[in-house]
Amino acid sequence: MIEISKLLESDLETAKSLTDTEGWGNSSEDWNRLFKISLPIGAYDGDKLVGVTTAFDYGSIGMIGNVLVSEEYRGKDVGTKLVTEAMRRLESCSTVRVHSTMESASFYKKIGFMAEGMSTLFRLDADMKEFQPFAIDSDDNIVPAGRHLDEILRMDKRQFGGDRSEYIKDLVSYLPECAFVALDDNNIVKGFIVAKGESNWYEVGPWVVEPG
């Protein structure tokens, strides 16, 4: 019988192996971060981890991610049980969102989610010796993000609508050489970009700018 419960820290490497099978690129560090800043949920067949998801409580906004079920357990409502539990844990949020591939869109619609928009994943292959730390242009208004952390957090809350401060602070601290802000002529932060990753793989985001 499948039981849904909090993901055990001892099963983080198993969770990584699940996402590895799909080529999602989640590193061990990513899973350690997710365990720390999200509400990690596991589907267990006895002591065996067969599915995972992560729920993020950002105050008024909740986010569900990393929904994945081991191939031999698919088609048995395990994914539905995981998402249902994530929604239960985010019931204090006024809105819950989930990022989905086109192949999985029908699954979320059956649960009750509505399509809100579409996104596209972009990929950049580069010589990693040149790619880390990220090179920036010579404009003096592009500066490291660490000195402007409070401004970044206020701006993100305005634009995102929820409070992602712990997540963003963790990313800036973990990879400061890949975190930048754009300043206007009055040295006011107008945008920021952060990234996560290690070795030969990086994912850019959140990437937020003020309108205009």
What residues fall within each predicted segment?
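Helix-loop element at the rim of GNAT/NAT acetyltransferase active sites that forms part
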Residues: 10, 17-29, 155-165
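A short helix-loop-beta-strand connector motif used in the catalytic cores of GNAT acetyltransferases and
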Residues: 27, 32-51, 63, 95, ...
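Conserved beta-strand in the GNAT
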Residues: 42, 48-56, 61-68, 187-197, ...
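Conserved acetyl-CoA-binding loop-helix of GNAT-fold acetyltransferases
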Residues: 69, 75-88, 110, 212
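Acyl-donor binding region in acyl/amide transferases
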Residues: 73-76, 90-92, 201-212
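Conserved GNAT acetyl-CoA-binding A-motif
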Residues: 89-101
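Conserved active-site tyrosine of GNAT-family acetyltransferases
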Residues: 107-113
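Amide-forming acyltransferase catalytic core, primarily the GNAT-like/NAT-type
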Residues: 114-203
